[in-house]
Amino acid sequence: MEMASAFTLNVRLDNIAIITIDVPGEKMNTLKAEFASQVRAIIKQIRENKELRGVVFVSAKPDNFIAGADINMIGNCKTAQEAEVLARQGQQLMAEIHALPIPVIAAIHGACLGGGLELALACHGRVCTDDPKTVLGLPEVQLGLLPGSGGTQRLPRLIGVSTALEMILTGKQLRAKQAVKLGLVDDVVPHSILLEAAVELAKQDRPSSRPLPVRERILAGPLGRALLFKMVGKKTEHKTQGNYPATERILEVVETGLAQGTSSGYDAEARAFGELAMTPQSQALRNIFFASTDVKKDPGSDAPPAPLNSVGILGGGLMGGGIAYVTACKAGLPVRIKDINPRGINHALKYSWDQLEGKVRRRHLKASERDKQLALISGTTDYCGFAHRDLIIEAVFENLELKQQMVAEVEQNCATHTIFASNTSSLPIGDIAAHAARPEQVIGLHFFSPVEKMPLVEIIPHASTSAQTIATTVKLAKKQGKTPIVVRDKAGFYVNRILAPYINEAIRMLTEGERIEHIDAALVKFGFPVGPIQLLDEVGIDTGTKIMPVLEAAYGERFSAPANVVSSILNDDRKGRKNGRGFYLYGQKGCKSKKQVDPAIYPLIGAQGQGRLSAPQVAERCVMLMLNEAVRCLDEQVIRSVRDGDIGAVFGIGFPPFLGGPFRYIDSLGAGEVVAIMQRLATQYGSRFTPCDRLVEMSERGESFWKTTATDLQ
């Protein structure tokens, strides 16, 4: 049976050809290799029809133009040469579109990303809608790749090299107003008149390129170019720590095109695309993409979720305010906040106001839309308005008796179907539900701070939690824009459990004489966004260390922190950034000076700060403990799969994405190598480095956690 075409041609009475993009059976339009013949057949028809005045590409999907190329095409390539051929085929197709003798216009609504933007760049003009769904970008770098269908050559010539480099190197997505300001699109119109606006543009002569600003023209010349690429290269190296080869190749390819012409540029682009597709970094990043997509499709349980019409939140503090924001402004659900103090309610309301007002200032949101979203949030000091809430999220202090009291109050003041979700980071959910009348409706819903930025949530059912409660909570998390993983109700859950030994080891090295900045720099060089000591300062030393005694009580000596170090720091009223006193010095608000270690910290904990370990040795000690604990979590069924373990670590604590997560990283090293490293470290530093039984068994059998495919498990 012949597959329905993703590209169809219709000619209007005014002799404008409309090419409609609609990939059959898919929510999103993505470009596949087999579509090339369909497009070429349409191009042939257009060339043969001498009466045509112009061409318009438009999508039939309600919220996307083209979301990019099908990533599976890259995974199917076995060699760099095969991936290079794929890129050259894309380049050739775009060149054929651009070579049409009549104006070709892209009518863009919704996501126009990757290969979709490259197709739009191959057109002679672009019109997009003013809808918030409309975004344009080249996010290939986030998959360890570069744009392979001409994007590295066309974009710098259209909007200027410095602006293009920023887009390509970061994967930054532009909204409509930004795109028209930079010259990426020719016009921005309401969705209702998109097609007509594009048709009118197609009836004119080919749109002439807008002259680049003087600055961009200078930067494209030999002298300006040399300075620009040196500066951008240095900045990029500092940001990536040399862990992402795609950024270096992007700079090389763009510069080649500007210095030697487009022919050399296209050649360099295709070659670099092929080579990058085979790098372990790209393979790991693509695996993370597939795994996160898979997690987002996972309903959490087989039961159907209950309806979600409104949510209540207990506590208007930092976490409560953040949860209220994502519930109202991302999920679009009415939120009622209860706090015993009106100031708590005001704090939560101001939290959402600050987030939304920032969007208004950046022109990402209209003031009227801000007011509409804020109207979804209300507050109370009692349970007025809570009677019919479908789900209550508790975000009060980490105190078991208090949380048990909250369960009792919710059961007394809310409907019998109301779910109670605790945002605890350390207390067992089973204990919180111990006296509940309806324990099947009690569950953990652990957000990470800052709530609006951190993508992960842990969903923690206890032994009596119902399947429907799990499914409903997963549904809410997804509506809030989060990536949820379901974890077992054991001390520390998953993320904090694997994070604690990592931070403990950093503190232990600090007491042994390693410098704070050396420890942090070593882990940043390894690939973490911040080092473990700085992370402790950022989350709050009191908050970050509160869970350590809980974990030590549950799992024993391997979770013990260096004696008296944490208490010495806390007794000196050091809580980190939040009170301006931590491991680092904090100047006045708004001060942009380079962060500096507080030298008073060393005598406080009886350390010298001399240091003798290399950066790789520092990173090895912290990371190996994290890997070992992640495997234990899998063995104890704290996580349901290695997929969840990798996603939880990458999205929850910033485990280096280019390594693919703890389990992908173990596979890349080999279980045997990991066991050998840990046995060496155990001999040097103690039994906490003893590899767990599962790792030893896998080492002996030569097993790995993942199969070679992106989503299958052993």
Curated annotation (Swiss-Prot):
Q: Which domain of life is it from?
A: Bacteria
Keywords (A to Z) from UniProt:
Cytoplasm, Fatty acid metabolism, Isomerase, Lipid degradation, Lipid metabolism, Lyase, Multifunctional enzyme, NAD, Oxidoreductase
- Keyword Thylakoid listed? The answer is no
Q: What reaction does this catalyse? A: a (3S)-3-hydroxyacyl-CoA = a (2E)-enoyl-CoA + H2O; a 4-saturated-(3S)-3-hydroxyacyl-CoA = a (3E)-enoyl-CoA + H2O; a (3S)-3-hydroxyacyl-CoA + NAD(+) = a 3-oxoacyl-CoA + NADH + H(+); (3S)-3-hydroxybutanoyl-CoA = (3R)-3-hydroxybutanoyl-CoA
Q: Which compartment or compartments is the protein found in?
A: Cytoplasm
Q: In which pathway does it act?
A: Lipid metabolism; fatty acid beta-oxidation
Q: Which residues are listed under the site Important for catalytic activity?
A: E118, E140
> One GO CC annotation, please?
cytoplasm
- Oxidoreductase as a keyword of this entry, yes or no, is yes
Q: Which Pfam families match?
A: 3HCDH, 3HCDH_N, ECH_1
- One GO molecular function term? enoyl-CoA hydratase activity
Q: Where are the transmembrane segments?
A: none
Q: Positions of the region 3-hydroxyacyl-CoA dehydrogenase?
A: 306-714
Q: PROSITE patterns, from UniProt?
A: 3HCDH
Question: EC number(s)?
Answer: 4.2.1.17, 5.1.2.3, 1.1.1.35
Enoyl-CoA hydratase, as annotated region: 1-190
Q: Per its UniProt record, what InterPro entries does this chain match?
A: 3-OHacyl-CoA_DH_CS (IPR006180), 3-OHacyl-CoA_DH_NAD-bd (IPR006176), 3HC_DH_C (IPR006108), 6-PGluconate_DH-like_C_sf (IPR008927), ClpP/crotonase-like_dom_sf (IPR029045), Enoyl-CoA_hydra/iso (IPR001753), FA_oxidation_alpha_subunit (IPR050136), FadJ (IPR012802)
**Which GO BP terms sit in this record?**
fatty acid beta-oxidation
The entry's family comment says: In the N-terminal section; belongs to the enoyl-CoA hydratase/isomerase family.
- Subunit structure comment from the entry: Heterotetramer of two alpha chains (FadJ) and two beta chains (FadI).
- Function statement: Catalyzes the formation of a hydroxyacyl-CoA by addition of water on enoyl-CoA. Also exhibits 3-hydroxyacyl-CoA epimerase and 3-hydroxyacyl-CoA dehydrogenase activities.
- Name this polypeptide is given: Fatty acid oxidation complex subunit alpha
Task: Record the organism.
Answer: Escherichia coli O45:K1 (strain S88 / ExPEC)
